[in-house]
UniProtKB/Swiss-Prot annotation:
Membership in a protein family: Belongs to the UPF0235 family.
SUPFAM superfamilies cross-referenced by the UniProt entry: YggU-like (SSF69786)
A Pfam short name: DUF167
SMART domains noted in UniProt: DUF167 (SM01152)
NCBIfam families associated with the record: DUF167 family protein, PRK01310.1
Protein name stated in the entry: UPF0235 protein OCAR_4310/OCA5_c02140
Matching InterPro entries: DUF167, YggU-like_sf
Highest taxon of source: Bacteria
Source organism (scientific name): Afipia carboxidovorans (strain ATCC 49405 / DSM 1227 / KCTC 32145 / OM5)
Amino acid sequence: MTDPWRYATHGVMVAVRVTPRGGRDAVDGIEMLANGKSVVKVRVRVAAEGGEANRAVTELFAGLLRVPKSKVKVASGVTSRIKQIAIEGDPKQLGEALKAATSIES
């Protein structure tokens, strides 16, 4: 299974699948979609109304990766459960933090 994130010059782009009203804000590992792509499974407490779920996802990643909230943005999929999250920072450090947060064995 490939990592669900891509390294870029200024950070990483993470593919996520969001479950709103999931009971708690958490990362639940990595999942393979039917099309063969890997995504980080994320659940948030809030409903997908008025951008609340997107805000919760960006805040969750900011906290997990210890980056400012302003460095985490929804790059695509604003109204979809499948999203691309752009995170600015050192790509190597972000990749290591993502591996730890998703419990990937190196």
